[in-house]
Design a protein with these regions (language model features):
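Bacterial Sec-dependent N-terminal signal peptides
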Residues: 1-31
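Non-catalytic accessory segments of hydrolases
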Residues: 24-195, 219, 361, 475-488, ...
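Mobile gating loops/cap/lid regions near enzyme active sites that modulate substrate access
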Residues: 60, 419-544
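Alpha/beta-hydrolase active-site loop
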Residues: 117, 191-213
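Active-site loop->helix "elbow" adjoining a glycine-rich segment at hydrolase catalytic centers
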Residues: 141, 196-200, 228-231
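Substrate-access "cap/lid" subdomains that shape
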Residues: 210, 244, 253-375, 410-428, ...
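Alpha/beta-hydrolase fold nucleophile elbow
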Residues: 215-227
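Short glycine-enriched nucleophile-adjacent loop
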Residues: 231-243
C-alpha cells in the first residue's frame, strides 16, 4: 500500500470525530470526549455525548433575559461549548406536600436554582445526517409556578427519541412571579412582564425553528406537548400570535383546566399589591431587580390573598385553583381571551391530542383513611354530595368502569379537575373543524404500594415517554406496564409525525366529535368508547 494512501486513511480516522459522529458507531454505553457529538447552533458549536446510541445535549442556552423583561438571543460563544449536564431550574418555592409514599413514587429531582435558567435539552438518534425527524418539544408541569424539565425521571427524552426516531426537546423557563408579575403600569421597560414566562417558551420554539435541523430534526414538523401546567402552556401557545407557525401539532395531557386567561387589570392589581407589601413607591419599581427571590416570594404570599379578598368583596370570585401566577390577557402577547374566535382561529389547522387520567388528584391519596373505607363508608361519604342519587352515581361508575373493584374507586374518579375541561377543549377544537382532535383517558392502575397510586396525576408520562424502566417505583416495572408503554409511546410518536395517533396494537382510534364522543381508554387492553362517562359527568355537574 502506498504511503500516501495510508496517510489519507489515517487522516480520515483522525478527522472523523471532528464532524460529530452523525450516527453512533461505538458499542460502549457512553461515548463522550473531544470531537464527540459536536454540532452547530446559531450561537456556536455544542458538544454532547452519546448514551446507548442516542445523542444527548443538555443545558444549551436558547435565550437570556433580565428580570421581568422579554427574553433575548444569547451571546455567541467561541469554540465548542460543553452541553453534558442539565442547566439550572427557575427558582421556585419549597415544596410542602411531599411525603414518603408520594416521593417514593415520583422520585423528584429539584435540581439547582438560578434565574439564569433559559436552557434546553435535546435527545436525537442522529446529527448532521440530513434526516428530517419529527420534533417533540416537552413543556413540564407544575402549573405556571413550579416544576422544571428535570423534575421527574419520566421527563427524560432518550427512550422516546430512540423508540420513534424523533428528536425530543425539553426546556426550562421563568415561572411564578419571575415569569408573570405584571409591572407594565410602571414603565415601558416592563411592558412585557406579565407574560415573559410564556415568551421564554416562544423563544425556545424559535431556537428549535432555527437550529433543530443540525440535530437531525425537521423544523417544519414540531409537536408541542405538555402535562398538567405543561398542558396549560400548550393551550396558551395555541392562542398566542407570536407562536403561530412554530409548531404544527399539539398534545395536552391532564392540562385542560383553563377557562380564561387572567384579566389584565387584575394582574396589574397584583403588581401594585407587591409594591405595597414591599413598601415601595411606583418610582422605586426598579428596586425589584435586586431584591432576592425569597423576599419577593414572601411578599407574593401576602399580595395574592390581598387581591383575592378585594376581588371577592367586589363580587368577582376566583375560579379554578385560586388566584396565582398564570398567563395574562395583556392585549399584546395574548390579545385574545382563551376561547375567543380569534384565538381559536390561530391554531385551527393544528391537530390536537387531548386527555387526562382516570383518578388524577384522587381523594384516597389526599386522605389515606379512604383507602380502608367499606362500601357503606363510601356511600355515606358520597351522600353528602349526591344525596338520593348516590346509588345512581355508583351504578353509572360501574357502567363506565366495569373494572371498579375497591370501594375507594368510587371516590377517586376525576369528574371535576381535568376531565370536564378535556371535553370542553375537544368540543371547541372539533367545532373549528379544520384539523382533527383525538381524545384519550389513561385508566391503567399501578400495582405499587398495594395499588394506592391507581391512575394518579403524572403517571401517564412514564408511558408516553416509554420510560417504565426509569419509573419502576411508580409503575412496578411489570410486563403489562412495558406493553402499554410501547403502544402509547408509539401513538404519541405517530401523532407527532402525521397528526394521527393510530398505532399497531391499538384498536382503530377515530377522531373525536361532540356527536361521537370517541375516546381511547388506555388500560392493559386499550379500547375505544363513546360518551363513556357522560352520565357521570352530568351527575357531577348537577351535584357540586
Amino acid at each position: 500500500m502506498k504511503k500516501s494512501s495510508i496517510f489519507l486513511r489515517l487522516l480520515a480516522l483522525c478527522l472523523w470525530p471532528m464532524f460529530g459522529y452523525s450516527q453512533s458507531k461505538s458499542g460502549d454505553a457512553i461515548v463522550a470526549g473531544d470531537g464527540v457529538a459536536v454540532t452547530s447552533t446559531d450561537n456556536g458549536q455544542v458538544r454532547g455525548y452519546i448514551h446507548n446510541g442516542t445523542f444527548n445535549y443538555k443545558g444549551i442556552p436558547y435565550a437570556t433575559a433580565k428580570r421581568f423583561m422579554a427574553p433575548e438571543k444569547p451571546a455567541a460563544w467561541q469554540g465548542i461549548r460543553q452541553s453534558l449536564v442539565y442547566g439550572a431550574v427557575c427558582p421556585i418555592d419549597p415544596t410542602t406536600t411531599v411525603n414518603d409514599p408520594i416521593e417514593f413514587a415520583f422520585q423528584h429531582n429539584w435540581g439547582y436554582m438560578s434565574e439564569d435558567c433559559l436552557k434546553l435539552n435535546v435527545w436525537t438518534p442522529g446529527i448532521n445526517d440530513q434526516k428530517k425527524r419529527p420534533v417533540m418539544v416537552w413543556l413540564h408541569g407544575g402549573g405556571f409556578s413550579a416544576g422544571s424539565a428535570i423534575e421527574l425521571p419520566s421527563y427524560d427524552g432518550e427512550n422516546l427519541s430512540k423508540k420513534g426516531d424523533v428528536v425530543v426537546v425539553s426546556i426550562n423557563h421563568r415561572l411564578n412571579l419571575l415569569g408573570f408579575l405584571n409591572l407594565s403600569a410602571y414603565g415601558d421597560k416592563y411592558k412585557s412582564s406579565a407574560n415573559v414566562g410564556m415568551m421564554d417558551i416562544v423563544s425556545a420554539l424559535q431556537w428549535v425553528k432555527q437550529n433543530i435541523a443540525n440535530f437531525g430534526g425537521d423544523p417544519d414538523n414540531v409537536t408541542i406537548f405538555g402535562q398538567s401546567g405543561g398542558g396549560g402552556k400548550v393551550t396558551t401557545l395555541m392562542a398566542a400570535p407570536s407562536a403561530k407557525g412554530l409548531f404544527q401539532k399539539a398534545i395536552v395531557q391532564s392540562g385542560s383546566y383553563q377557562t380564561k386567561f387572567m384579566d389584565n387589570e387584575v394582574s396589574k392589581k397584583i403588581g401594585a399589591a407587591m409594591l405595597e407589601v414591599l413598601n415601595l413607591q411606583p418610582s422605586q419599581v426598579d428596586s425589584l431587580q435586586t431584591i432576592s427571590y425569597e423576599r419577593l416570594s414572601a411578599a407574593a404570599k401576602k399580595a395574592l390573598p390581598k387581591v383575592a379578598a378585594q376581588l371577592k368583596a367586589e363580587g368577582k370570585p376566583i375560579a379554578g385553583f385560586g388566584l396565582g401566577w398564570e398567563p395574562v390577557n395583556d392585549g399584546v402577547f395574548l390579545p385574545y381571551q382563551l376561547n375567543d374566535a380569534a384565538a381559536l382561529e390561530l391554531s385551527k389547522n393544528v391537530p390536537l391530542l387531548v386527555g387526562s387520567t382516570k383518578t388524577e388528584f384522587m381523594a384516597s391519596l389526599i386522605n389515606p383513611a379512604i383507602r380502608n373505607y367499606s362500601l357503606d363508608d363510601v356511600k355515606t361519604a358520597l351522600k353528602k354530595r349526591y344525596g338520593d342519587k348516590t346509588d345512581t352515581y355508583m351504578a353509572e361508575v360501574l357502567k363506565a368502569y366495569p373494572n371498579t373493584v375497591k370501594p375507594s374507586d368510587y371516590m377517586d374518579i376525576d369528574l371535576a379537575t381535568f376531565r370536564p375541561g378535556v371535553i370542553r377543549q375537544a368540543n371547541a377544537k372539533a367545532v373549528a373543524g379544520a384539523a382533527p382532535v383525538y381524545m384519550y383517558q389513561f385508566a391503567w392502575a399501578s400495582p405499587v404500594n398495594d395499588g394506592m397510586y391507581k391512575s394518579v396525576h403524572c403517571i401517564d408520562i412514564c408511558f408516553e415517554f416509554n420510560n417504565i424502566a426509569r419509573c419502576e417505583e411508580m409503575t412496578g416495572g411489570g410486563k403489562e406496564a412495558y406493553a402499554l408503554a410501547g403502544k402509547m409511546s408509539q401513538a404519541w410518536v405517530n401523532f407527532a409525525g402525521t397528526g394521527n395517533p393510530n398505532a399497531k396494537g391499538l384498536p382503530n382510534w377515530p377522531a373525536y366529535t361532540a356527536d361521537n364522543g370517541a375516546a381511547m381508554i388506555f388500560d392493559n387492553q386499550p379500547v375505544v368508547k363513546y360518551h363513556n362517562d357522560a352520565a357521570l359527568l352530568k351527575l357531577a355537574a348537577e351535584n357540586k
